[in-house]
Amino acid sequence: MAAGTSIGTTPGGSTSPETPPEHGLTGTVISVDAMGGDTGPAAVVGGLAIAAEKNPDIAFLLHGDATELTALVAKRRALDGRVAIRGTSDVVTMHDKPSQVMRGGKDTSMWSAIDAVRNGEATVCVSCGNTGALMALSMVRLRKVPGINRPAIACLWPSRAKSGFNVMLDVGADIKADAQDLLQYALMGASYARNGLGNPTPRIGLLNVGTEEHKGRAELKAAHDLIAQAAPDNDFEFVGFVEGGDIPSDKVDVIVTDGFTGNVALKTAEGTAALIRDFLTQAFEKTPWSKIAAMLAYTSLRRLSKRIDPRRVNGGVFLGLNGTVVKSHGSADATGVAAAIKLAFILAQSGFTERLAARVASAGRARASGAATPEEEAVSGSANG
């Protein structure tokens, strides 16, 4: 963790949910960790300005070096009257271990941003910072929704679906997942698809090395059966096992996997998209004729570039917590930050966290009211909002 400036326009520190400090903001308030990303606070403030220009109902509680942030915000007319700055004296770097942050991170912008959600000052937290530290702090400060074993990170994946995106989880919260964890991921992913993408009956697929039911590890086969049993009562359709090539397809809406596999798939896709853009650029710049062809195809190429631009789907959502946290890429520029803010606003407007928690509580009561088998308990005690 690195030292910074502690001057701020609003007081920091921990506050009880009953008496949150007044930040004077109206509309949907998003708590933003301005520090810790690879591109610095200028990109974060730039993203806030883009989001503010497109959405008059959004406001920001910004956490970090107050002197630097005040100067950056003052340059953005779109942010006039829509930002309150919470000064902090420390920053979580990409090299900090989660255990270090847990022991000595109370004065960091990340801790302050999460606590704003915990204290009811903001609906959603957005951060470009250290993923491990952000998940650890989120779990400790916000706590898991009762009934959830492991939180997950869900991302939007460009696809052939009508919405243009599929949901994939877990993409990095936990490298391990047993059958009941995968069941809970399916239920949380279905809830995300309903509330984030407006899909009332999402189709769930379990990522495997093949679509045949006899393939895969034992926990995948067990998860297959649990998810299939849960589908009729939880408003989703289970399409069974899917392969890597199905992730961007229109045959599935939510892809469920463990965090190790999901993270590798995500990083591979991002690298492949960058490679395709580089190849196209090289091809159209090779000869005078190819440059002319590029000019003639400019509109189509621009449309393609936008479709595969990873900045458009920037923002992984932490699912299974008593509060919504959106993790932006550490290298996100202003466009990427704006995309994460847009996603945060959509989830805030949908009441996603409350819906998920209410469904889990309802399932828990149903489980407690009758004698259930272990498999039935796994199904009824999971999130299905």
Swiss-Prot record:
Copy the pathway line from the protein's UniProt record. Answer: Lipid metabolism; phospholipid metabolism
Mostly located where?
Answer: cytoplasm
Localization, UniProt? Cytoplasm
Which residue stretches does the UniProt record annotate as biased composition, category Low complexity?
1-17
GO CC annotations? cytoplasm
Assembly notes: Homodimer. Probably interacts with PlsY.
Q: What is this protein called?
A: Phosphate acyltransferase
Query: Which species expresses this protein natively?
Result: Dinoroseobacter shibae (strain DSM 16493 / NCIMB 14021 / DFL 12)
Source species taxonomy: Bacteria, Pseudomonadati, Pseudomonadota, Alphaproteobacteria, Rhodobacterales
Question: What gene name is listed for this protein?
Answer: plsX
